[in-house]
């Protein structure tokens, strides 16, 4: 008897419907076809152990299973459930008429329990698109799948529950999630707040500008100056995620298997802070399964690299394309995958290996050669892609003990949101552009054209600091953001002057140190 069940395979962020054809005839052999990987090939062993543990015998007849389309690689243990149901259907133990109405996904334990799998959200989106009556998933995946509206999602504890449901002998209700309500209920106040930061008003201003225009920023200063402390508080002044951004971000984390148990939506902007031992592949994504890397996991949020020169030069150089294109393409032998990676790049670094170059309170023990080797790990093209780089001085103890709490994040965030709304209105005609940092050269001419005085100032800065054309564009983008924070329609000379002041690493004294 031939029976068909349905599941899905996920490549990148896209799911493809997989038809599992199960045929039982006389004999005693097992055949599996359809370009299955090792985990799928091992499914029959798990199914054979699970069936007796839920009260069913494993068929001893000749069993052939085909996963179609045959030219698409099938990976992972999520095909356990649809294969097991197909075997029981072909053996006459399940009403085969109901099988075509549901998509199934889930790993089987030897005791018959359903274990969670990754990438359930893209599969749920595909099930709705293909107009299946419902999706059956492990109970631990139910909230992730149920955020897809207009699709009945059933979370099951074990194989016996699925069999009872398909035979109509058990009453199971689909999980209903009000996606919009769920999203807003999960938003919370950040625990880290800029009011904790004493002093550093100039650096806070830089971070406010960065947040307002989604600009990349690098903080340079000695140990203990508060670089990491302020970077970790940057999410608290960013605009909240929109529902569309939340769904897109959740989908990436779902594919990567990074969603926690019973998590339905990511409602906060991601803040990724990988260790400096991070590999090139872990940064961009890859492995044999073309999984998302740190640049994609930071999509719609922040990628923070603490102690930037400690990362390998190869790892840092692969950031150049994602920072420019805001997407990453991972190519394999017979397919390629594209992931979005539109993030704010935030870096911190010491000025030298010992950390105290230029610090008036500590003596630097590094030789000029050591400083040059340390800073040369950061290439000019990478630094060009960072809009703002600013020095972070140490706050003296006498000032720390006297200073009142700083301005709270909520106040700064209000100004940032006002500036972002101006940008959203400005860029409405341009698809995929929502912040000044994303402006093209043509948009710069339209929205950030400097006046004659500003142009002279820029020309002098370009000549003295030997700036690249890319740095010129970055200065204009930052100046446009400063003008938006002030509510000014035109970019003026004071905005240009402030933006030039945020190019610390372009100054000659830094250039002499090897940057």
Describe each PLM feature range.
Residues 300, 306-307, 318:
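Walker B catalytic acidic pair
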